[in-house]
Amino acid sequence: LMYLLVYFSTALVIACTGTMLMGALAWAGLFTYSIILAAMLQISGHLFFDTWYEGSYGILAAVRDLGSPLMVIVSFMDKYSSGNYGKQLLILIFVLLLMAVLSWMAFCRRKSENTGKALVYTWMEPVLSALITIPSGLGIGLIFYMIPEDSSKTAWWIFGMILGTILVHGVLEVIYEMDFRRFFRRKVQLMIFGGVVAICALTMKIDLLGYDRYFPAYDNLQGVVVNVCNLSYTEQLCNVEKKENGIYKIRYTATSDNSSGLLDQPVMKSKALYNSLKDIRLQNEKGKKSGRRMYVRYINKQGFSVCRSYSVSSAQAQNLMEALYDEQTWKEDRYSFFQLDKQYLKEVTGIFCDGDIHSLFEKNAEKRQALAEALRKDILENGGQTVKDQPCAMLMFDYAGIPSEGYMDEWGMNVPAVQEGERVSTSVLVYPAYKRTLAILEETGYPLSMDELSVEYIDVYYFSSEAAGEDDEAFSDTEPLSDLEETENGYKVRYDKKEQLEALKKCIRPSQLVNGWTIWNADVTMEVVLEGQESTGGDSGLYMTFAGEIPDFIRADAKAAHVTCLLYTSPS
């Protein structure tokens, strides 16, 4: 079937063209046009729309996957490898029959007196010119738009569009007539195409269609799907679905550039979630864009889907995560790996407030299973208020020998099953509200709060900003509250007073035990030295990060050390 599709596509090109040059160009265009057009639309959306979703869906997916025989073949091969190719097979057969009919009609109606022309059917000339000139003008303009980094981008963009439109249109006219003197043969047509290019460019530049302003009314909304993989990256999870025959279907959390991250997750609808998304959209519209990206699929009552991508601040992410943790279906899907039979759970490890990794209940399988079950119940029974607190531990569950039909990796690619069964590794944060889980973890004796650590001193390393000089007005009259010891990359301060240690213990955590949506500072590193230990001199050891309100003495020393990015954004 694939061979026949290529054959009839080639026959169609031969029947419609009269020269080798035009035939070769038309054949290449038939097989690659939709790919290039889809890529150009993606780049345009990324450059001009703040809420552009880079995944492939809807019209864009249809253009890319169905717009050329090559992509029809590629899509069929991709689905064939996963065993779910019925729909793609029907599309392949339909396109094959379409190409066969068109090539037969083109051959039968081909006039012998036109065989020496570039195109046998002259009515194709303006159609091909429009299909090639307009996207080419926009595409060449994009290339010029991306080159400069200053305010001249718009001027270069306009120049590139004018140049591209004139050049491509003229080259096509030369190819049609095989005469360089025909470069400006159709001036009116060129002006019309130039006007269309200008309208398309203006539409993108000032968002005439309201792409970034889109937000559905609550009453017209069937539900939303939210992908927060960039916000809660601390946890490593996968979706598990048990089939009737005992075989599992496994899907890892999809990344931002694959539409499966919004297709296979639960549909939700609640006022709290809606209001949280509305606030995020309004802040993006006002230009207040900071933090990480999140992805949303809105489904209206007619069944149509619209996807968007938003920048989310720490406070907005906190409100969003609270709303999501109130959604039972979302939690059941997010933590569905707990559906795996207990026999496949081989190991449980944990990270506690001392920052170390400990293996738990190595010789007690029943205890490991009880711990997993306790955590599952705690997650499902506790709501959004749970994630207002910082985690006190992280548990990692390792499963092996799982009978599976294969799995979908984080890039949305299908990986075939292996005979010995799949391995699944997950990590889940434990919050203070998870009473059942904490009761079991207390038996281990590992610290579940910073208060349980006996800290001798804390070395804080301040990495000075390169932009801040000794004469910078922002730092000129700042006096440190502590002794700054100069290091290769900045300064170090040792805090060993009781009140300092108590204040720091309230606002620091091992980096693994910080909510993924909490913003902390990368210009400060803290090495915590417990009683009886020795400092490693900053090369390795127990490192912490800010996860609470930063004390005034830290802020003062950071400013004196020329640290310009001392930041913790409170989610409250």
Language-model segments: residues:
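Hydrophobic alpha-helical transmembrane segments of polytopic membrane proteins
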Residues: 2-18
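Alpha-helical transmembrane segments and their helix-start/interface "positive-inside/aromatic belt" motifs
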Residues: 18-29
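Terminal transmembrane helical anchor/hairpin motif
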Residues: 36-120, 145-158, 213-219, 229, ...
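Membrane-embedded alpha-helical segments of integral membrane proteins
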Residues: 109, 122-176
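Internal/C-terminal transmembrane anchor helices
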Residues: 132-136, 175-211
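Membrane-interface segments at or immediately adjacent to transmembrane helices
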Residues: 204-296
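Short, structured surface segments that line ligand/substrate-binding pockets
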Residues: 282-314, 381-417, 515-546
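Conserved small/polar residues in nucleotide/adenosyl-binding loops
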Residues: 568-572
